[in-house]
């Protein structure tokens, strides 16, 4: 007997992907393999196995990618100071390339003819996933249910779930939940009342940060050590990449650090509103910029700042594996070996304040910058410098 074709579905165990699982089974004569990338999201392994097995799935894979995600994706992005449209630290964007890469690995392992994802037809993630799929498995078919099925709204999904006895989760108010994406780097919340920009975000949707009103009335100090541009220790203790970020998430979250409410311009051309929490990532971004300010020369820093918007846009748009992103990463990392030292941050009710910078490889000269008299800086050269630049105004 000829074996069935196989489809590998990026599966979370939640409502959307459980519906997609059932839909694939109904519409394709194929075995569906459920694949979950553990990148530090709030994962319920029992729920994933329970919900998939209810629908007759035999192969359920949960792959631990937390350290790979932080070390090979988050850290390079932090080194590039990637911020989209001034505030977004790209927490969802940076996760998709790794998931797509590993999903294709599983597809090849099982000799699957297709992969599938749960991204909506209006979102950026469909692009991010499918660019990753193409890079690693250009001959593998992509099935994107949201672009082809007849279920066009959340209401349609809920009705389909009821019809097929698929568990429908509830939020804290007992209603169908917001659209939430999370990983060890961030949590995003979208949909429902947030779709109207005039509505403020209710406090109960925040999962990893307290409000400034509930944060301690006393500031906290956190020390982050860097080696070759990457964090290696928090408050003097070394951690693995995922544990280090988890530690910073806890410290920042309890001090109300890392909340962003953003109306962003999606790659596909529409605007969307999302509420993001990136507590540990916010600390890393502040600390990394601070340590670079005393270890890198002016030209290197300015070149990095010049390319940053494009670098961030490439990540946002799903071009992590593009030649252009690789090229910009080489520029970003050109002098990372000099970025060593420690930064202390003071945290208070959502604020992040640089407390101190300490390094043995400093590009900062106290003698040259001092207001006291010194012989290391020739002031007569300044007049010639100014006269030269006056010519540019003629």
Regions found by a protein language model. Give the residues of each.
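Nucleotide-activated chemistry modules centered on ATP-dependent adenylation/adenylyltransferase
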Residues: 1-10, 15-394
